[in-house]
Amino acid sequence: MSITKEKKTELITRYGGAATNTGLPEVEIAIMTERINNLTEHLKVHKKDNHTRSGLLKLVGKRKRLLNYLTKVDVLRYRKIIAELNIRK
């Protein structure tokens, strides 16, 4: 379950400001959060899909590392992205 190209560009412009700011931590976290939400919905239906579950756990770990990096760089940006995406930390 991947996200569509339109949804991805929408997330990039919302959290990156411009369509070319794809490397910002906020943009990457937003895209990962969207993918995590899609995979979570998939796993609610397909409970025994262990391959997807392991991919989901890897994705959550990557997002966690990016959030830790953002905490070290700028705490205000971290708090803002946590509040906007409803991520618990």
Swiss-Prot record:
Family matches, as InterPro entries: Ribosomal_uS15, Ribosomal_uS15_bac-type, uS15_NS1_RNA-bd_sf
Record carries keyword ATP-binding: no
So which domain of life are we looking at? Bacteria
Name the SUPFAM superfamilies for this protein.
Answer: S15/NS1 RNA-binding domain
Q: Tell me which SMART domains the record gives.
A: Ribosomal_S15
Matching CDD domains: Ribosomal_S15p_S13e
Q: Name one GO molecular function term.
A: structural constituent of ribosome
Which is one Pfam family of this protein? Ribosomal_S15
Q: Does the keyword Hydrolase apply?
A: no
Entry keywords, A to Z: Ribonucleoprotein, Ribosomal protein, RNA-binding, rRNA-binding
A GO biological process of this protein is: translation
How is this protein annotated for GO cellular component?
Answer: cytosolic small ribosomal subunit
Q: How does it assemble?
A: Part of the 30S ribosomal subunit. Forms a bridge to the 50S subunit in the 70S ribosome, contacting the 23S rRNA.
Annotated family: Belongs to the universal ribosomal protein uS15 family.
Q: What does this protein do?
A: One of the primary rRNA binding proteins, it binds directly to 16S rRNA where it helps nucleate assembly of the platform of the 30S subunit by binding and bridging several RNA helices of the 16S rRNA. Forms an intersubunit bridge (bridge B4) with the 23S rRNA of the 50S subunit in the ribosome.
Q: What is this protein called?
A: Small ribosomal subunit protein uS15
Question: Could you tell me which species this protein originates from?
Answer: Chloroherpeton thalassium (strain ATCC 35110 / GB-78)
